[in-house]
C-alpha cells in the first residue's frame, strides 16, 4: 500500500513540476512580485527556509530581502511585511482587502473551515460572529462586572503560594497556578464557573485537551503537507489525531458546560436581566437562529485558545523578566507601595494610576510578544502592496515582533527597559496608535481581547510583586528564557521554577 502511495506521489510530483514551470512562466511575465529567495519547482523555497518560520528567522530574511519579501512555500505564496508603513497598509489602509484569514489543513479541522470568528474569512459571517461575541466578552461593562473576580483569583494565588513551603525555599513552577487563575478568570465570564484547585479532575482534563490542541496546531511538523498538497497523504495520521482531539474537546465543552447553561436557561427569565454570563448571550443568539450549535462550540474554542493561553504566556514572560531584572522588580514594588500604601492590594482601577506598572506590561508585550506574527492575513483577490503585486489568496504575515524590536526604530531593543515607555516612547500605547508597536494588531481583525488582557496582566503581576520578592531558584543567577515559537505563538521553552519570598508588612 505504501509503495502504491509513493508511486502516485512521485507521478504527481512530475506533473506538478511541469505545471509549476508553465504557471511560473505565464505569471512571472506580467506580475511584479516582492523580492525573495529563488524558488525551485513544486517545493518553492521550502527546502531553503524549512518549516520553522518563526519571527526571528523571518527578521533575518527581512535584513536580506527588505521590508516586504515573498516566500513560495510549495503552492502557497507567503508575503512577509516588516515595516510600520507596510503594516499600516495591510492592517488599516487596505484592511478590507487584506482582511481575510488563510486556511491550513490543521486549522480547518479545529475551526470547522472557518466557522469561528478568529480564523474565518472577512465578510458577513465574521461581522455576525464579532458582533455576537463583543457584547458578552469585550466591553467596559464586562470589565466592571468581572474585575472583582479577577482580583479575587489573584488574591487566591497569593494565598496558595504563601501556604506552599516550597515556594520560599527551593521554589515552585508558578505557571501551573497561574494557568488555574486564567481559566477561572475566563470561565467565570464564559460559564459562571471556576475550578477549586489545580488538581480538579475536570480542570486537568480540560487543560490536557487544550494543551494537546495547541501542540498540534502550533507545531511546524505539518507544514510540508499543507504547503505541498501532493504530500498530504503522509499527514493522514497527524490529521486523524487532530480530529480525535477536536471531538473530545467539543464533547467536554458540551457535556460539562453548555448543557448545564441550557438547563439553567430553561428555569430563569430569558430577557437580558436573566442572563448571567457570556454563554447565555451566545445561546440566546443560537435560539434566535443567528448562529448554529457548531458556531457556539467554535466560540468556546476561540476563547479557550485566543484569550486564555495568550494572556497566560504574557503573565509568565512578565514575571520571568522581573525575576531576571531585580532592579525593575524593586522599582515596580516601590511604586506600588508609594501609590497604594504597603500591603494595600492593587485593584483594577488602580492599574491606571501606576505608570511604571503600565510600562512593565508594555515592555513585556514588546520584547516577548505572545503572537509575534499576529494571526495571518489573506487577500481574497489580486492586490497591490507597496509597489508590488500580491497574488490572490496569499498568506500575509506582519512581523509585529520585528517592528517592535528593530534597532532602526527602537533604542537598544534587546534590553528589557520599561523606562522607554516613560521617556522616549511615552506616547506609544498597546492599542496600535504607533505601527512600530502592535501587540494586539490593528484595525478590523485586531484582537478584541485587549480590553481584558491589560487589566488582568496589571492585577496579576501587581499582586505578585506587592506580596513577594521573586527570585531565581538556588544556584541560578537568572531564569532560562529560551523562546519556544510556534505557528503564531511565543512562549518560554521551559516553565520556570521561581522562589517567592513573602513580604512582611
From Swiss-Prot:
Q: What is its EC number?
A: 1.14.14.91
Q: Which reaction does it catalyse?
A: (E)-cinnamate + reduced [NADPH--hemoprotein reductase] + O2 = (E)-4-coumarate + oxidized [NADPH--hemoprotein reductase] + H2O + H(+)
Binding of (E)-cinnamate, residues: 213-218, 306
Tissue specificity comment? Mostly expressed in stems, and, to a lower extent, in bulbs, roots, leaves and flowers.
Name the PROSITE patterns for this protein: CYTOCHROME_P450
Q: Which cofactor(s) are needed, names only?
A: heme
Record membrane topology: Single-pass membrane protein
Q: Which residues bind heme?
A: 447
From the UniProt record, give the pathway where this protein acts: Alkaloid biosynthesis; Phenylpropanoid metabolism; trans-4-coumarate biosynthesis; trans-4-coumarate from trans-cinnamate: step 1/1
Q: Which UniProt keywords apply?
A: Alkaloid metabolism, Heme, Iron, Membrane, Metal-binding, Monooxygenase, Oxidoreductase, Transmembrane, Transmembrane helix
**InterPro entries listed in its UniProt record:** Cyt_P450 (IPR001128), Cyt_P450_CS (IPR017972), Cyt_P450_E_grp-I (IPR002401), Cyt_P450_sf (IPR036396)
- Which parts of the chain span the membrane according to its record? 3-23
State its location(s): Membrane
GO terms in the biological process aspect are: alkaloid metabolic process; lignin metabolic process
Q: Which GO terms describe its cellular component?
A: membrane
Single GO MF annotation: iron ion binding
Q: Which CDD domains match?
A: CYP73 (cd11074)
Q: What Pfam families has UniProt attached to this entry?
A: p450
Q: What top-level branch of life does the organism fall under?
A: Eukaryota
Among PANTHER family, the record links this protein to: TRANS-CINNAMATE 4-MONOOXYGENASE (PTHR47948:SF4)
Job of this protein: Catalyzes the first oxidative step of the phenylpropanoid pathway in higher plants by transforming trans-cinnamate into p-coumarate. The compounds formed by this pathway are essential components for lignification, pollination, and defense against ultraviolet light, predators and pathogens. Trans-4-coumarate is a precursor to all amaryllidaceae alkaloids such as galanthamine, lycorine and haemanthamine, and including haemanthamine- and crinamine-type alkaloids, promising anticancer agents.
Q: Which family does it belong to?
A: Belongs to the cytochrome P450 family.
User: What is this protein's record name?
Assistant: Trans-cinnamate 4-monooxygenase
Q: Which organism is it from?
A: Narcissus pseudonarcissus (Daffodil)
